[in-house]
Amino acid sequence: MSVFDSVRMDGQVAVVTGSGQGIGRGIAWALADAGCDVVVNARRLSDLEETAAGVRERGHRALIVEGDIRDFSDEIARRAIAEFGRLDIWVNNVGGSVESTTYELANMSDEFFRGMLELNLTSAFQGARAAAANMPNGGAIINIASGAGMRGSPMTGAYAAAKAGMINLTQTLALELAERGIRVNTVSPGPVVTEAYLGVLGISDQLEKLRQTIPLGRLGTIDDIGAAVMFLSSPAAGWITGQNILVAGGRTERSYQYGGRKQQGE
């Protein structure tokens, strides 16, 4: 097999949670481009139908499983096996924060904090557990975290704490599942242009200020994240496990601070 052929995953079956739109949709389409049949999951059927249509346009089968991922992972895995007879890749993409809702940790309720952990961290744990139970011949689990989980994140501390937990969850799962041939990695996106992201920031000079903190000079796209997940899922990444890949155009805590100082001096 050539290096170029090693990114192909013809005949493999992937589950992508939170794939109704945005990053999850981009991941589903990237995996279909690489040869996978894809199980798509989200809460809104209309969104899932569009994602599934994109998978089919790429020449592969799609299965829609509508529902809230929390406490639903085992059912998604069951349906994937029933429909396709195998499960090779599981992408935990469900997550996020409440749009336009920010709190300092000192003023945050227990309910809000627990809700962020359930949505972002517990759902990933449940998904990984369901995947591992249905990968007898090995496979790949990819957790979608965030650059926010790699640094302090004022006003979105619960979200950041959950994503940091996801990165550690990945490292532990990688060690526990290695002997079974299951690789586990994390992709941590930086700022990516999606409907949800624009809903928080709006189309304004805020986006330009954010762009100035990114060394490569642009915001990310869903294709950027999809490509990273496709690689980590493929045989080309067969000796990579337990890693967190920051896909953020070079944006780190240091570059973010540098960008902020630059703006203040303009």
Predicted regions and their residues:
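Alpha-helical segment proximal to the catalytic Tyr-Lys
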Residues: 133, 175-179, 238
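Conserved glycine-rich cofactor-binding loop
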Residues: 13, 20-22
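Short C-terminal tail/terminal secondary-structure segment
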Residues: 2-6, 102, 151, 230, ...
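Residue(s) in the substrate-gating loop at a strand-loop-helix junction
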Residues: 146
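Substrate-binding pocket helix/loop in short-chain dehydrogenase/reductase
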Residues: 101-105, 109-114, 210
